[in-house]
Amino acid sequence: MSPLISAASVLAAGLAVGLASIGPGIGQGTAAGQAVEGIARQPEAEGKIRGTLLLSLAFMEALTIYGLVVALALLFANPFVS
């Protein structure tokens, strides 16, 4: 394996995980903050807000997991190496 391809694969794997984590991290922080604010304003809707929050957090976390899968594919099943 060429050292250039190996170095580029490691760099791309790091970028994949890093960039895939930025958006969901910001979104999860915003969603959790808004959920806490909503529960503080309307305590009787806590169950519905919490359920919606957990579902949306799971969908946001899936985006980070996709980035991790791409990174693992680049590191261990590199398609650029013959």
UniProtKB/Swiss-Prot annotation:
Site (Reversibly protonated during proton transport): E61
Keyword hit for Thylakoid: yes
Membrane topology: Multi-pass membrane protein
InterPro entries per the UniProt record, alphabetical: ATP_synth_csu_bac/chlpt, ATP_synth_F0_csu, ATP_synth_F0_csu_DDCD_BS, ATP_synth_F0_csu_sf, ATPase_proteolipid_c-like_dom, F/V-ATP_Csub_sf
Gene Ontology CC terms: chloroplast thylakoid membrane; proton-transporting ATP synthase complex; proton-transporting two-sector ATPase complex, proton-transporting domain
One function term, GO molecular function aspect: lipid binding
Coiled coil: none
Location(s) in or outside the cell: Plastid, Chloroplast thylakoid membrane
Additional notes on this entry: In plastids the F-type ATPase is also known as CF(1)CF(0).
Main location: plastid
Chain ranges passing through the membrane: 7-27, 57-77
Pfam families (UniProt xref): ATP-synt_C (PF00137)
Keyword annotations: ATP synthesis, CF(0), Chloroplast, Hydrogen ion transport, Ion transport, Lipid-binding, Membrane, Plastid, Thylakoid, Transmembrane, Transmembrane helix, Transport
Domain of life (superkingdom): Eukaryota
Family in the record: Belongs to the ATPase C chain family.
Name of this chain's protein: ATP synthase subunit c, chloroplastic
Biological classification of the source: Eukaryota, Viridiplantae, Streptophyta, Chlorokybophyceae, Chlorokybales
Matches recorded under PROSITE patterns: ATPASE_C
Organism: Chlorokybus atmophyticus (Soil alga)
Complexes and interactors: F-type ATPases have 2 components, F(1) - the catalytic core - and F(0) - the membrane proton channel. F(1) has five subunits: alpha(3), beta(3), gamma(1), delta(1), epsilon(1). F(0) has four main subunits: a(1), b(1), b'(1) and c(10-14). The alpha and beta chains form an alternating ring which encloses part of the gamma chain. F(1) is attached to F(0) by a central stalk formed by the gamma and epsilon chains, while a peripheral stalk is formed by the delta, b and b' chains.
Function: F(1)F(0) ATP synthase produces ATP from ADP in the presence of a proton or sodium gradient. F-type ATPases consist of two structural domains, F(1) containing the extramembraneous catalytic core and F(0) containing the membrane proton channel, linked together by a central stalk and a peripheral stalk. During catalysis, ATP synthesis in the catalytic domain of F(1) is coupled via a rotary mechanism of the central stalk subunits to proton translocation. Key component of the F(0) channel; it plays a direct role in translocation across the membrane. A homomeric c-ring of between 10-14 subunits forms the central stalk rotor element with the F(1) delta and epsilon subunits.
UniProt-listed Gene3D superfamilies: F1F0 ATP synthase subunit C
